[in-house]
């Protein structure tokens, strides 16, 4: 899918392009390619003289391959967060700033992009050129990360009440561990996301491509990211605490089970010993010829079971 965005009356307007003829007269500040076809890439090459490589959004964490200038164009690759309840993930986006037009290439639509499109349509003078689009995307990305962190706070608060304010059985503990693991994964993705945004914005500042107002906006984005770092660190500590508490409750429940088996084994040991003794069946055993030998042995075995249980209960070991 290929969308172009043009400025008119201080607002950003979107137009979906279905052919080269539709693209030719356009004068966009931003061209967004979502999972582009080779044909759409060919239109870009014809209209703007820009060749988009086939591997432009391949994963590569080397900084030299993610931020560079080539033939007058600035190339930036960044990760953007998608907070999906089923599968949160970081999506790679490749930006190319070429002749005052921003080109973005990605495989799926992103919440940050939708947020910017909505704001740019409603707020006049929000965007003046292609570099503003890129900065506003990073600003919206930091804001989206902050909103997602607030969601983690809320979810962990619910887990905390479930773990700390009630009797936790194994099933509840397993559910709590799964919820904690999901939040830990999401928090890690946010931390990776803001780290990547910091590197991209810092590169733009070092490249001397921003005017004074844009440079100040970039500094504000970095300050916002710095504040998010402390929140992600705190959430990691809280997640570790809840994880340890939940595992502790699981250990307590397991110890209760082991305690029951231990008490049962100790209580059943004396009658087993008595039964073993009388099972020897030696001729010299007087109880074999005694009329009440069998009920006597049964009574002794029952008493040997009751006595340990009575003693354990008195000591409070069965509570």
Segments from the language model and where they lie:
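Membrane interface segments of multi-pass transport proteins and intramembrane proteases
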Residues: 208-216, 287, 292
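Non-catalytic, surface-exposed connector residues within folded enzymatic/regulatory domains
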Residues: 174, 212-215, 236, 251
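Peripheral, non-transmembrane regulatory/ligand-interaction domains of membrane transport proteins
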Residues: 1-206, 210-213, 220-227, 231, ...
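Hydrophobic alpha-helical transmembrane segments and their immediately adjacent juxtamembrane loops
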Residues: 223-319
């Amino acid at each position: 899918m290929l969308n172009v965005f043009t400025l008119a009356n201080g607002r950003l307007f979107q137009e979906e392009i279905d052919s080269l003829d539709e693209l030719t007269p356009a004068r966009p500040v931003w061209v967004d390619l979502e999972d582009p076809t080779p044909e759409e890439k060919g239109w870009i090459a014809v209209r703007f003289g820009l060749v988009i490589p086939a591997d432009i959004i391949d994963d590569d964490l080397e900084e030299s391959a993610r931020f560079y200038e080539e033939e007058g164009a600035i190339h930036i690759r960044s990760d953007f967060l998608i907070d999906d309840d089923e599968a949160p993930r970081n999506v790679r986006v490749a930006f190319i700033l070429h002749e005052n037009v921003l080109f973005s290439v990605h495989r799926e639509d992103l919440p940050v992009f939708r947020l910017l499109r909505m704001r740019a349509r409603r707020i006049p003078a929000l965007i003046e050129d292609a570099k503003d689009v890129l900065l506003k995307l990073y600003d919206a990305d930091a804001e989206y990360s902050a909103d997602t962190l607030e969601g983690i706070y809320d979810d962990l608060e619910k887990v905390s009440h479930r773990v700390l304010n009630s009797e936790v059985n194994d099933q509840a503990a397993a559910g709590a561990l799964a919820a904690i693991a999901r939040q830990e994964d999401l928090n890690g993705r946010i931390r990776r996301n803001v780290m990547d945004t910091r590197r991209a914005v810092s590169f733009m500042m070092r490249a001397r491509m921003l005017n004074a107002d844009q440079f100040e906006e970039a500094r504000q984005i970095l300050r916002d990211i710095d504040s998010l770092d402390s929140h992600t660190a705190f959430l990691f500590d809280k997640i570790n605490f809840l994880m340890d508490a939940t595992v502790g409750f699981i250990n307590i429940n397991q110890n209760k089970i082991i305690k029951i088996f231990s008490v049962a084994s100790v209580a059943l040991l004396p009658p087993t010993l008595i039964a073993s003794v009388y099972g020897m069946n030696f001729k010299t055993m007087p109880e074999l010829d005694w009329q009440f030998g069998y009920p006597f042995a049964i009574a002794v075995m029952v008493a040997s079971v009751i006595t340990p249980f009575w003693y354990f209960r008195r000591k409070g070991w069965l509570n």
